[in-house]
Amino acid sequence: MTAYTNREAWLLEAVQLLKPIFAAKRHIVPDDCQVSCGFASTGTRSHHIGQCWSRRSSTNERNQIFISPALGDPVQVLDTLVHELVHAVDNCEHKHGKEFKKIALSVGLEGPMRSAGAGKALKEQLVKIADALGPYPHGQLKVHHVRKISAPRPRARCKSCGFEVPMYKKFLTFGPPLCPQHKTEMEQVGPWED
């Protein structure tokens, strides 16, 4: 067992150890995949724990995979890496559609495809691979997902039937709309002025 000093070396070796799982099902993981620890394109605003970019997205024409620095457990990192390698196998062509699902199920992923994770048999293999790789040389980031609190949206309500519609700010200058049932002007509800 090699003691890896950086997470990228660990991740690249993990790809090599995961390739036979794909090869056994006749799927080829590209030899030149690049794997790094980093946030998905949505940054910390989302709960994405991995992302694969297609070859056409990079100037060196290689799939680039990012594993979230919020992950620290080696088996969870490998689980996420398998999911992203499925994307690399089909060069991100099918997102989480039928072709992705076919590949994912064949290598042992389960559950809804957008968040497909290792089934029991695959998880057992991942535990062995994690043991072979040794500790994941990474300090897990404690990321807090802060929800943006938005102001309540202006609305209009019919005085007769209570029918309510949200209003877009650009239409507020025209005044409240008419109730589609009663044909009367609706009352303003919420913040109609900035």
Residue ranges and their predicted role:
Residues D79-C92:
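Active-site recognition of the HExxH zinc-binding catalytic motif
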Residues M1-D73, C92-D194:
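Metalloprotease/metallohydrolase-associated module, dominated by Zn2+-dependent proteases
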